[in-house]
From Swiss-Prot:
GO cellular component terms listed in the entry, alphabetical order: cytoplasm; nucleoid
Family annotation (InterPro entries): MukB, MukB/SMC, MukB_hinge, MukB_hinge_sf, MukB_N_dom, P-loop_NTPase
Name of the protein: Chromosome partition protein MukB
Domains as described in the record: The hinge domain, which separates the large intramolecular coiled coil regions, allows the homodimerization, forming a V-shaped homodimer.
Key words, A-Z: ATP-binding, Cell cycle, Cell division, Chromosome partition, Coiled coil, Cytoplasm, DNA condensation, DNA-binding, Nucleotide-binding
Record's keyword annotation contains Iron-sulfur: no
Binding site for ATP: 64-71
UniProt key word Zinc: no
Coiled-coil intervals: 335-501, 540-622, 666-695, 865-940, 1007-1053, 1100-1143, 1238-1294
GO molecular function, one term: DNA binding
Location within or outside the cell: Cytoplasm, Nucleoid
Protein task: Plays a central role in chromosome condensation, segregation and cell cycle progression. Functions as a homodimer, which is essential for chromosome partition. Involved in negative DNA supercoiling in vivo, and by this means organize and compact chromosomes. May achieve or facilitate chromosome segregation by condensation DNA from both sides of a centrally located replisome during cell division.
Quaternary context: Homodimerization via its hinge domain. Binds to DNA via its C-terminal region. Interacts, and probably forms a ternary complex, with MukE and MukF via its C-terminal region. The complex formation is stimulated by calcium or magnesium. Interacts with tubulin-related protein FtsZ.
Length: 1499
């Protein structure tokens, strides 16, 4: 993300030419200069778009008011220095006093959106310019996360400004921030090196190597310490986090001593484990030999047994196949003899099956005829009932229709009377509801008018009035009577026409059912045609069974004729002839008899030849068996010779070659023995030299340590233990023979003890001096090109050359130790090789001696297996000749069988020549089939329509005339009835008007008239109600009568449908039977059945006779068939066995070859043992193996799986598992061989040598408690001296009332007791260190618990506690004290000091930590690198001017840079000050910065 913002002003115009960092920094001085930070660059920070702060060599001050950006600038520096988000937390801008803080660790709010940079520019001691920084970017989301990526740039010129590198100028007042990818491209274009780091550890490793940070930060713990130091410096005061763990900051971890202890413990542990393994291997040697021997016998015997069985199975399968093929050949020859009788038997069987089918068909036909006759009787009976019911049903239908008409008329009259009663009741109600006469009269008048209007509308009379209403009423009454008479006439005519129409419709429906839909006019012609053909079709249907039987007989005879023709054709085709007459067939019969006699004689000659060859084969077999008996011993001798050839790499042609090689092997063994002894002596010398140089304090004689402790002094080598490897030759030559001297404080006090020394080196040097502040000014020395001249005394000079291999100082000793250890490892490897060569020669000579005694007489004899192969070739030739004879014999048999087969065909053809001669048989069959087709069609027609034709025949004459006027009469009747109803309605409306004539007149006496009118209406109502009740009774009677008639009709209809349904079912069943019966049908069916039964009995008698003859002839063929089947079954079973064994054998071979064990399993001598002997050998070995592997779960499971005889590959897997187990158990790192047997033999001697060697090494590596105590005391004393040196640099520091600062280091009482117990002679503690089951760490932990039983050790193990006790830092207590006013020395705590004093004291402690880190890392840093020193101080206003001057003086004295922040009232005289002012112009906010050089600075 790039942004374009307005560039900020850098410096004031008059100050642009001023350089903050002097140019002298970049010049190469005579000595090594300390690295310095040149500048800090902030890009796109809050208030700083592109700002570079040049840092002063001493103090850089950020001055400004609150919010000016001082803390932001320091935060940018800290972020670039420690870019670890898990540590960064700027508390002064987040939550004051909070321990956790917000999710924004004070960094997110200091950045602006987009790409941001914080870059440090430094120049190290090598005058290399390094730009190290971070790219920061806000991550979207409410968590306020920041993404950080670290990078570095090297190779830029000094003149290039970091701001110009990180931004791109867009215009005069605008610039764009480059992304990380764009920055990389730009740097590479300029020829510099850009590197991005994927972890903070890599970033800090680069900064350490280039001298930007004081120590290597390997882990997050180291980064946390560094950050806490920077944080304590930034916020000022005494940091409790540092003072509480001051040991971790000031005291370096003595990794060398600790690692030496761990290495010694590991070596001891490994030696003890190796010794136990050696003892176990020696005790298991006999078991291993027994295991490998029994495993080989167990697997190899089964392996060779399977190989022998596979070969035997193959040979057996080949013999079975040979026997099978021979039997099949015999079967092919014998089958020709059985063809005739087999064919005849087959034909008789087929004929019998056909007769059985015909007989069964005849029986079924007889049953069908009987069933059809019974159905026919029932059909006739049901047909009569149906006809009778049809007549009754038609009569009853007429009665029901008449009753229905009467009921409808009565209902119509009843409805008319009901309407009239309702009207009269309405009038009465209207009259009764009238309140006065006028209302009644008005109401009556309105109703009369409504009735008159209704009559006008209904009658269509516009001039209708009260006066002429009666005239019209009479006229309509006359019309109603006329229409009633017409309806009665039409009903009478309708009843007469309906009877004629019913018969016509019935006959027409029957014709349509048979002939399909036809016009009514063509119904009579179609009926005549059907009735005319009906008798002929009926007769043809009756003849169908006879025609079918006749056709069956003709077809059977025709099939016999075709079969005979086919046999004759096959015979001519096989024989290649065209015989047709009986004479020709008889002549050919005689020729075949002569041919059979000749073939029989030739067959006898071949039998004699085969017997001679078999005798010769038996002789060769006896010779083969003799060679096979002598082969195993020769194979064993040859295998032994081959093994010796492989091991020696020589080829032996005869016995003398073997003896010469044995003599040469003895000479070679003596030579190797001498070389081995020389290497052993040289290795012992190197071990002694390494042991002397491995002493932690540099003393080569352990007695010097005792003397130094006795005199209260320190070894000179211990004081110079940290000397650099470059200075080691100088100091080694400077002190010469006195390099192993003891430095004591008072020589006079020591002189008194010299006389009482018992055990001391021959030359003991003592030097007087302070061990805590010793220097090399003891002698007056002058360094020359190749050595050092030392003025020992006025009259004595000593010149010592620089040693080629200096041993003064730990670094020099470690370097030389590395070389000696490499040389010793090389000597050990050579010694092991020579020892192995000696053992190899001894073992090879022993094996040759054994070979000479057992196998030398047989090894060089001719190969018996080669002779056996030659014998096998001869046997195979004889077998081939026997196979050829067998083939010829089979061909003779085939010819003989063919001749016999032709004889059988001739015997069968001669009796059937008469049938073949009948040529008219096919025409008869076709003619009979056509007649049967016609009869079957008529039979189907009669079956479908016979009943319909019988019903049509009596009523067919009704079709001659069609009653077409029936429909017209029916329409006239309905029309007349409608007119009658309309006339009745009109007459009723006029009658209503007439009844209301009085309502049209007006009378004066209304009441009288009303009463009279009411009386008339009541009278009329009573009359009409009486008529209605009478009419209701009449309707009820009509309904009952109609219901009775209808019930009878329904019963008749139901009975008719039932009878008719049963009739249809019977007719369908008869139709399904597919035949038409008559009086003679039963007799014909019985005669046909009896005839077929007679024919079937005759055929069965003939077939029984033929089968008896066939059984006699087939007895030999059946025996041969059983023989073939047995041979085939045996062959297939054997072949399956071979195939299955092949699959398993392939798995075994592949497994053995891939595992390189095939050669070990192929024991050729086992091939001559029987299967029982091999199985017995395998079973014996299995019993022994079960006992041998009983304690090994893996081998026990593998052995159990291998016992499955169906899977021989499991035995090979077991063999491989045993060899793999042996390879794992033996010491493959000592003896290199692929053969476990050879390795076991080699290990026996090699392990006995290692036993002595490891026992001696364990004695050398044994750690004594006294030596541990001495090492601890020396290390503690050295660190105490170093702390005293640090205190010298803090003596003149003063802040306020604090006049001095110092570090106090003491040994803890509990650990002092432990040191005394380790170095003392208490016998009660030695049991812990003499226990081989405990390591030294565990022993020292147990001792610590004994001495301090009151201390709770928690859940920690003894090993963990012991490892902590081997760290000298846990023995010390380290505190900071200050000398303050009248109080004297006090412990440095923030509560006892003022703010300024606490800040100054804390800064002093941090300086000590930094200086200690630099010294600690001096050995692992480049010799030409002195790291940068820079600390921070925020809110420096809390210090007074004197304290600030003290800080400046401290920075100048310690060559340290300081970055402080202060309000505007702080203006130090030295260093560089930046005035920061935050300004807002428009919508943009930026910090205006002005850089000022201190006015007290020296040019």
């Amino acid at each position: 993300m790039s942004e374009e913002l307005e560039l900020e002003s850098e410096f004031l115009p008059e100050e642009k030419s001023e350089t903050i960092v002097p140019a002298t920094v970049l010049t190469q001085s005579a000595g090594i200069e300390r690295g310095k930070f040149r500048s800090l660059t902030l890009i796109n920070w809050n208030g700083f778009f592109a700002r570079t702060f040049d840092l002063d060599e001493l103090v850089t001050t950020l001055s400004g008011g609150n919010g000016a950006g001082k803390s932001t600038t320091m935060a940018g520096f800290v972020t670039a220095l420690i870019p670890d988000l898990t540590l960064l937390h700027f508390r002064n801008t987040t939550e004051a006093g909070a321990s956790g803080g917000s999710r924004d660790k004070g960094l997110h709010g200091k950045l602006r959106p987009g790409v941001c940079y914080a870059v440090l520019d430094a120049v190290n001691s090598r005058q290399q310019r390094i730009l190290a920084g971070v790219r920061l970017q806000q991550v979207a989301g409410r968590d306020k996360k920041v993404d950080i990526k670290t990078f570095s740039i090297q190779g830029l010129e000094i003149s290039q400004n970091p701001t110009a590198v990180l931004t791109e100028t867009v215009s005069q007042r605008q610039a764009r921030v480059l992304s990380l990818t764009e920055l990389k491209d730009r740097i590479e274009e300029q020829g510099a090196q850009f590197k991005q780091y994927h972890s903070v550890a890599d970033y800090h490793a680069m900064m350490f190597e280039l001298g930007m940070i004081p120590r290597r930060l390997r882990s997050s713990s180291d980064r946390s310490k560094f950050y806490k130091l920077i944080e304590a410096s930034l916020y000022g005061g005494i940091s409790s986090a540092i003072t509480k763990s001051l040991r971790d900051y000031l005291l370096p971890e003595n990794l060398g001593v600790r690692k030496a202890f761990q290495d010694m413990e590991s070596a001891l542990r490994e030696n003890r484990m190796t010794l136990e393994a050696i003892k176990m291997t020696q005790s298991d040697r006999d078991l291993f030999k027994h295991l490998i021997t029994e495993t080989t016998n167990y697997v190899a015997s089964d392996y060779m047994r399977n190989a022998n069985e596979r070969q035997g199975n193959i040979e057996t399968a080949l013999s079975f196949r040979k026997e099978w093929y021979a039997a099949k050949s015999e079967q092919d020859l014998s089958q020709h003899r059985l063809i005739d009788l087999s064919r005849e038997a087959a034909e008789l069987t087929e004929n019998e099956k056909a007769l059985e089918i015909d007989h069964q068909s005849a029986s079924d036909h007889l049953n069908l005829v009987l069933n059809a006759l019974r159905h026919q009787e029932r059909i006739e009976r049901y047909q009569e009932d149906v006809n009778e019911l049809t007549e009754k049903l038609e009569e009853q239908k007429i009665v029901v229709e008449n009753a229905n008409e009467q009921l409808e008329e009565s209902q119509l009259q009843f409805e008319t009377l009901e309407t009239e009663v309702d009207q009269i009741r309405g009038q009465l109600a209207d009259y009764q509801q009238a309140l006065d006469a006028q209302q009644t009269r008005a109401l009556q008048y309105q109703q009369a008018i409504q009735a008159l209007e209704k009559a006008k509308a209904l009658c269509g009379l516009a001039d209708l009035s009260v006066k002429n209403a009666e005239v019209y009423h009479e006229e309509f009454e006359a019309q109603v009577e006329t229409l009633t008479d017409r309806v009665l006439q039409l009903e009478q005519k309708m009843s007469i026409s309906e009877a004629a129409k019913t018969q016509f419709d019935k006959a027409y429906q029957l014709v349509c059912k048979i002939a399909g839909e036809i016009p009514r006019s063509a119904a009579w012609d179609s009926a005549k045609e059907l009735l005319r053909e009906y008798p002929t079709q009926k007769l043809q249907a009756q003849q169908t069974p006879q025609l079918r039987a006749k056709l069956h007989e003709l077809e059977q005879r025709y099939q016999q004729q075709q079969s005979a023709v086919k046999i004759l054709k096959d015979f001519n085709q096989r024989a290649g002839l065209s015989l047709e007459t009986a004479d020709e067939l008889e002549d050919y019969h005689a020729e075949q008899e002569a041919l059979i006699e000749n073939l029989t004689a030739e067959f006898s000659e071949q039998v004699e030849t085969r017997s001679t060859l078999r005798q010769k084969l038996e002789q060769l077999t006896a010779l083969f068996e003799e060679k096979a008996r002598s082969a195993p011993a020769w194979i064993t001798a040859k295998s032994a010779l081959e093994r010796l050839t492989e091991q020696s790499g020589e080829q032996f042609e005869d016995n003398q070659d073997v003896m010469n090689f044995m003599q040469a092997q003895l000479e070679k063994e003596r030579e190797f023995t001498m070389q081995r002894d020389q290497l052993e002596h040289k290795r012992q010398q190197l071990d002694e030299q390494i042991s002397r140089l491995s002493q932690p304090d540099g003393s080569e004689d352990a007695r010097l340590n005792v003397l130094a402790e006795r005199f209260g002094g320190v070894l000179l080598s211990e004081l110079y233990d940290d000397v650099a490897i470059e200075d080691a030759p100088y100091f080694s030559a400077l002190y010469g023979p006195a390099r192993h001297a003891i430095v004591v404080r008072d020589l006079n006090a020591v002189k008194e003890q010299l006389a009482h020394l018992d055990d001391c080196p021959d030359d003991l040097y003592l030097i007087e001096g302070d061990p805590a502040a010793f220097d090399d000014s003891v002698h007056s020395a002058q360094e020359l090109a190749q050595g050092v001249v030392v003025q020992v005394s006025e009259r004595e000079l000593r010149y010592s050359k620089f040693p080629e291999i200096p041993l003064f100082g730990r670094a020099a000793r470690e370097k030389y130790l590395t070389e000696l250890e490499a040389e010793r490892d090389k000597i050990v490897e050579q010694y092991a090789q020579r020892a192995f060569d000696v053992q190899k020669c001894q073992r090879l000579h022993q094996q040759f001696s054994q070979f000479v005694g057992l196998h030398l007489a047989l090894a060089f004899q001719p190969d018996p297996e080669q002779q056996m192969r030659e014998i096998n070739q001869q046997r195979n030739e004889i077998n081939r000749e026997l196979t050829a004879l067998s083939t010829d014999e089979q061909q003779l048999r085939i010819k003989l069988d063919n001749a016999k087969e032709q004889m059988q065909l001739l015997n069968k053809l001669i009796p059937q020549l008469n049938v073949i001669a009948d040529e008219s048989l096919s025409d008869k069959v076709e003619e009979c089939r056509e007649q049967l087709d016609i009869a079957e069609q008529d039979e189907i027609f009669i079956r479908q329509h016979g009943m319909t034709l019988s019903q049509l025949e009596p009523i067919a004459n009704t079709l001659q005339s069609d009653p077409e006027n029936y429909e017209r009469l029916k329409d006239d009747l309905y029309q007349a009835i409608d007119m009658q109803k309309q006339a009745q309605q009109k007459a009723f409306a006029l009658a209503d008007v007439i009844h209301r004539q009085a309502h049209f007149s007006y009378e004066d006496t209304v009441k009288t008239e009303t009463n009279d009118l009411n009386e008339k209406l009541r009278v009329r109502l009573e009359q009409v109600q009486a008529k209605r009740e009478q009419q209701r009774d009449q309707v009820r009677q009509k309904q009952q009568q109609f219901a009775q008639y209808n019930q009878v009709y329904i019963q008749l209809q139901s009975s008719f449908e039932t009878k008719n349904q049963m009739l249809k079912e019977l007719m369908d069943e008869v139709g399904e039977l597919g035949l038409t019966v008559d009086e003679n049908s039963e007799q014909r069916a019985r005669v046909r059945k009896d005839e077929l039964h007679h024919q079937l009995s005759t055929s069965r008698q003939r077939r029984s006779f033929v089968e008896k003859q066939l059984t006699l002839i087939e007895s030999e063929a059946e025996n041969l068939t059983r023989r073939i089947r047995k041979a085939e079954r045996d062959y297939k079973q054997q072949r399956e066995l071979v195939v299955a064994a092949k699959v398993s054998w392939c798995v075994v071979l592949r497994l053995s070859r891939n595992s390189d064990v095939e050669k070990r399993l192929t024991r050729r001598e086992f091939a001559y043992l029987s299967a029982d002997e091999l199985r017995s050998m395998s079973d014996k070995a299995l019993g022994s193996l079960r006992t041998a592997v009983a304690d090994n779960e893996y081998l026990r499971d593998a052995l159990r799986i291998s016992e499955d005889s169906r899977k021989p590959e499991n035995k090979v897997r077991f063999f491989i598992a045993v060899y793999q187990h042996l390879r794992e158990r033996i010491r493959q790192d000592i003896i290199k061989t692929d053969d476990p047997i050879d390795a076991i033999e080699q290990m026996e001697i090699e392990l006995s040598r290692l036993t002595d060697e490891l026992t001696g090494r364990e004695q050398k590596l044994a750690i004594s408690s006294e030596s541990v105590a001495n090492i601890m005391r020396k290390t503690i004393q050295r660190e105490q001296n170093r702390i005293r040196m640090l205190n010298q640099g803090l003596q003149n520091i003063s802040f306020g009332q604090v006049k001095s600062v110092r570090l106090v280091v003491n040994i803890r009482d509990t650990h002092a007791m432990l040191l005394d117990a380790l170095s003392g002679n208490q016998e009660e503690y030695q049991d812990l260190f003499n226990d081989n089951r405990m390591t030294f760490s565990e022993a020292i932990a147990k001792l610590y618990q004994r001495l301090n039983p009151h201390i709770d050790m928690g859940q920690r193990t003894a090993q963990t506690i012991g490892e902590e006790l081997l760290d000298y830092r846990n023995y010390l207590d380290l505190q900071v004290e200050v000398y303050r006013g009248a109080d004297g020395w006090l412990q440095a705590e923030s509560g006892a000091l003022s703010t300024g004093e606490a800040i100054g004291t804390g800064m002093s402690i941090l300086l000590m930590v930094v200086q200690s880190w630099e010294e600690e890392s001096r050995r692992i840093r480049g010799k030409d690198i002195i790291p940068c020193r820079l600390l921070f101080l925020d809110e420096a206003a809390r210090l007074d001017g004197k304290s600030i001057s003290t800080l400046f003086e401290l920075c100048e004295r310690l060559d340290m840079q300081l970055l402080i922040a202060a309000p505007e009232n702080i203006s130090p005289e030295k260093g560089t000050t930046y005035k920061l002012v935050r300004k807002i112009s428009g919508n943009q906010e930026h910090v205006h910065v002005v850089g000022l050089r201190g006015f007290g600075a020296k040019e």
